[in-house]
Amino acid sequence: MAHLIEAAPNPHQPFVVTAGVAVGAAMRELELPNKGPEAIVCVKDSEGTLRDLSFVPEQDSKFTPVPANTEDGRTVIRHSCTHVLAQAVQAEFPGTKLGIGPAIENGFYYDFDVAEPFTPEDLQKLEKRMKKIVKQGQKFERRIFASVAEAEEALKNEPYKLELIRDKGNVDPGSDEATEIGAGDLTGYYNVNPRTGEVDWYDLCRGPHVPTTKYIPAFALTRSSAAYWRGDQSLAGLQRIYGTAWESKEALEEYQLMMAEAEKRDHRRLGAELDLFSFPDEIGSGFPVFHPNGGIVRLEMEEHSRRRHINAGYSFVNTPHITKGDLFKKSGHLDFYADGMFPPMQLDGEVDEEGNVVKQAQDYYAKPMNCPMHNLIFASRGRSYRELPLRLFEFGTVYRYEKSGVIHGLTRARGFTQDDAHIYCTEDQLEQELTSVLDFIISLLRDYGLDDFYLELSTKDPNKFVGSDEIWEKSTSILQRVATKSGLELVPDPAGAAFYGPKISVQARDAIGRTWQMSTVQLDFNLPERFNLEYTSSDGSKKRPIMIHRALFGSIERFFGVLLEHYAGAFPAWLAPHQVIGIPVADSFSEHLEKVTGMLRDNGVRASVDTSDDRMQKKIRNHTTGKVPFMLLAGARDVEANAVSFRFLDGTQINGVPVDKAIGVITQWISSRNNKQPSEETVKKLV
């Protein structure tokens, strides 16, 4: 009935199932785990498609088990948990209509058309109901609808599901709606009571799902919010419930602890507390304003990056924020990215005194990307092979129309500044240039204190690409070699590339283990053709350059938010808006500290003295909360000895440090761009 491809049973080991036998039955024969974190929740066939354990192959087939504690396993658990949630909502709130409920990163959500917004008390009530459903061990049964009419009849009381059924075949495979409909059969999943055999609840869904609700060992509802049907503000308003589900109670608790820490580190909260930036309603959603404190941090970030780029051979350019629409027609952005662009402005039109149009207005757009303008710089004159590689770099502000529901502080904004580079090189230079770019990216990110990375390689979507198979295969092979040489973990992203070329993305883990996509290195076979970019080769012939898109931070704003959360607001001294604060024990010692901070300012250090009326202990508390890395205290003994006392954010202290020594320690710490917070332990070695 089934046999393992290798010798001993293993929850990750492929096995073969005989035609006509259910996968789950074959697994039981092999004694693969059905409980605990390694319980097999579904399988993956030879084409990479996830299948229910109830799946019956028509011919002998190989399958790979998917344990609960893998990313695929967790995704299936979370998707199944959305069905449990929706069943609970319709039981507790009769008359509720169902939207969609996909698994998302670290959790899930489900949208509902309900009379009133959900309250925290409602979520508690729903969790209790869900636990009862899980305890029942309801079976997930997949049923194929024989026709659209049959599906419509089954879901006749669910208007949003009916819309999805009628849209079958026209849904973006990458959208949340694709969870329920897409290519292949039109299917539903029925939750069957194991005791009575009766259907307790059902939903339109493609699956796969866990065998029974008992395979959902740990979950929690986290919050609710307003949402729009299919993410469109012009459509019906819905209520969304978010949750998370894991393979064990221990994994759930670990995640909840991480989320509690993440909440403390939320850059939006820290931005307000530390007076770094704000989002004024008068300006509009998704447009941050940096205050003086945040402006200093941003300036330091940009200046260090600028110096590193100059040393690495990049040429700085600058381009305008808006341009004629014809440029984005030429680049293809209006064909492929129009939904992500702000509406056009009509400019340059003229009318006479009688209102007759003398000159037609033209469409101008706020730029969503810098690359078309960089191509115009390349094409502004003839180029020789001797000029290549040509590396054009810009801190270029771009504007993208993000839906209001996805805007998230600095990490998902509508207006942001990219550290954007476009590199033009010959085919022979490509591998060396990619190696240099990747080394430069990792080195620069480490300068800012990130040091835990892995790479993701996005390869060709066979249904959506430009250029020949040969050039895709060759360039993908080069990217893979470059990534492998870096020594970093390489994770494949099959068919994940944009249509114009393969891509490497650099993923960074922060201080609490979260992953952020930081940098991208993208090959482009499309724009050099569209812009007819050429250079003169050594034999005098005209050739097309290869183009590399490269954004290191992604955007300055996003990177600012990532660093703010990574450091929990306590930026390294070289980035901190206030590097040194003088705190006198009494007012009479302020003059001594003014001299010390004056000498520090002469050395380029941001230093000042707190001369407020607050008591010393309150000043220490205030500046500890304000995350000032160096606090210098001075009392009678310090003044007499021409010394200061160090106070650090961790509460430790070093007393009686001579002023010259203190200034040397501080300037050395800052100029070396030390990313650790100073403390008694680390500074005492330098005193």
Curated annotation (Swiss-Prot):
Cofactor, free-text remark: Binds 1 zinc ion per subunit.
Gene3D superfamilies found in the cross-reference section: 3.30.54.20, Anticodon-binding domain, Bira Bifunctional Protein, Domain 2, Threonyl-trna Synthetase, Chain A, domain 2
Annotated region described as Catalytic, given as residue ranges: 266-572
Family: Belongs to the class-II aminoacyl-tRNA synthetase family.
One GO term describing the cellular component: cytoplasm
GO biological process assignments: threonyl-tRNA aminoacylation
InterPro entries associated with the record: aa-tRNA-synt_IIb, aa-tRNA-synth_II, aa-tRNA-synth_II/BPL/LPL, Anticodon-bd, Anticodon-bd_dom_sf, TGS, Thr-tRNA-ligase_IIa, Thr/Ala-tRNA-synth_IIc_edit
Protein name: Threonine--tRNA ligase
Cofactor: Zn(2+)
